[in-house]
């Protein structure tokens, strides 16, 4: 597996009462690569009414419903979730050079999710300094916006670093933060 967010999602989904619906607001798909529909709503419907899509997600999910949100996803969703104190926030951070290299590998190999290393495509990514610096600037601005939104709404988030997702204790602390009684006995590697 290449990214911590995929690994985190797998482990959250292993907790009874928790369902992470992947990148539900990715501009190109719903939930996972190639998916164009979720909760009976197609991509165009989700894009036209993200609030309605969130309602459908809550209504059609047993237990806690969640999704992964990245800075390049639908910006309207940011305001919807940040203004909802009932929506728990989990912030996963990573060394930006490692993140950039992982992203470049995904782009250049067209492998965005890797559960089976037999299918691993080996590439040596091209490092583009202006592109890298722009990504850092964009992410810094997004993180500042995120922190400010938490501050002005009096909310807190569960923060973890990329390396923390390999710590069973930290993931069980996250379950506690979410108010879920279940705990992981082992990490899920799939």
Please name every model-derived segment.
Residues 1-60:
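PAPS-dependent sulfotransferase catalytic core
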Residues 2, 164-165, 186:
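Short, surface-exposed acidic/glycine-rich loop or hinge patches that mediate macromolecular interfaces
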Residues 41-48, 112-115, 183:
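A polyampholytic, Gly/Pro-enriched intrinsically disordered region
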Residues 56-59, 148-153:
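Short, conserved catalytic or adaptor-binding loops enriched in Gly and charged residues
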Residues 61-65, 88:
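Loop/turn-to-beta-strand initiation segments
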Residues 70-148, 155-157, 165-182:
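PAPS-dependent sulfotransferase catalytic domain
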Residues 183-190:
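C-terminal accessory extensions appended to soluble enzyme cores
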């Amino acid at each position: 597996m290449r990214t911590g967010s995929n690994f985190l999602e797998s482990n959250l989904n292993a907790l009874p009462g928790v369902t992470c619906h992947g990148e539900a607001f990715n501009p190109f798909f719903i939930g996972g690569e190639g998916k164009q529909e979720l909760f009976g709503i197609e991509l165009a419907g989700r894009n036209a009414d993200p609030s309605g899509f969130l309602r459908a997600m809550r209504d059609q999910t047993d237990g806690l419903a969640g999704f992964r949100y990245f800075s390049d996803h639908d910006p309207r969703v940011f305001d919807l979730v940040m203004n909802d104190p009932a929506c728990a926030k989990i912030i996963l951070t990573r060394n930006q050079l490692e993140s950039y290299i992982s992203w470049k590998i995904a782009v250049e190999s067209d492998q965005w999710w890797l559960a089976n290393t037999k299918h691993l495509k080996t590439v040596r990514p091209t490092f583009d300094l202006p592109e890298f610096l722009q990504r850092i600037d964009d992410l810094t601005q997004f993180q500042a916006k995120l922190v400010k939104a938490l501050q002005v709404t009096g909310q807190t988030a569960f923060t973890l670093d990329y390396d923390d997702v390999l710590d069973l204790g930290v993931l069980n602390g996250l379950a506690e933060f979410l108010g879920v009684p279940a705990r992981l006995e082992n990490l899920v590697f799939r």
